[in-house]
Curated annotation (Swiss-Prot):
Designated name of the protein: Curved DNA-binding protein
GO biological process, one term: protein refolding
Function, as annotated: DNA-binding protein that preferentially recognizes a curved DNA sequence. It is probably a functional analog of DnaJ; displays overlapping activities with DnaJ, but functions under different conditions, probably acting as a molecular chaperone in an adaptive response to environmental stresses other than heat shock. Lacks autonomous chaperone activity; binds native substrates and targets them for recognition by DnaK. Its activity is inhibited by the binding of CbpM.
Cystine connections: none
PANTHER family for this protein: DNAJ HOMOLOG 1, MITOCHONDRIAL-RELATED (PTHR43096:SF52)
Gene Ontology terms, MF aspect: bent DNA binding; unfolded protein binding
Gene name of the encoded protein: cbpA
Keyword Aminoacyl-tRNA synthetase in annotation: no
Disordered: annotated segments: 111-130
Residue span, J domain: 5-69
Xref: CDD domains: DnaJ, DnaJ_C
Amino acid sequence: MDFKDYYKILGVEPTADDKAIKAAYRKLARKYHPDVSKERDAEDKFKEANEAYEVLGDAQKRAEFDEIRKYGGQHGRPFQAPPGWENRGGGGGFEGGDFSDFFSSIFGGRGGGNPFGGARQQQRSAGRRGQDVELELAVFLEETLSKESKQISFQVPQTNAMGQRTGFTTKTLNVKIPAGVTDGERIRLKGQGAPGSGGGANGDLFLTLRMAPHPLFDVEGHDLIITVPLAPWEAALGAKVAVPTLEGKINLTIRPDSQSGQRLRVPGKGLANKQGERGNLYAQLKVVMPTTSDESTRELWAKLSEKAAFNPRAQWSK
């Protein structure tokens, strides 16, 4: 198993703050998103960036990674977790997601470090009722529209008839993400926490949902915003552009003489509310200049500047 230095993967320093880490992740996610990138290894790099952000974007997992990084792990070199590392601490681990063996060896199946948030148990003083379990669960935008369940695994404490803790066991559930969920929303799964002792009732499972940042979409309420890059001639002459949505690409008509910053509304392609009604997708146009140009291209721009009676700063003279 090779060591993964998540700082190197995102291209940030170990001293980077949360804002810099998020910005680096979004840059890589946009670059290697399967709907955007044509590079052969784009999918692998996209998954690698997601994994790095799952760790560095969470304060608790980042602290654990920083600690294990001190053991001398070097990116891409063989590595083995220190003895006893996976048995440290109690609480809920998460098994699932498309993550590497390295990630699973460090964070899988134990509390305080898992792809979708730390976990903690709240001890109830009442009788022999089982403990409640609290987890943070990352939810991707696509999952809010999916009819499929999301599988989660976590650890729950085991007790004997006297209520004394004897160890931990892993519990796996299939959870349906409700329509219209928002970041920070807390849902309760009754009786899905730790088992009771001496005939006592099971504890409950509380999930705090955290909306994971998307590489393409920003969220405004139940609306989605996507930036659509356009070549200058596409904005001037009009075009048909394939635009990603959460459910696949659609063809968007760009009218002639479109402006950078203009928003086009696509009804019903946003997120769902509690009633299942969909918000809108707003395509925000952004005119992008070519990064390089040859002599013939510059000649065309020069001819255009001579013929086009256009002053973009005309309002300054008023």
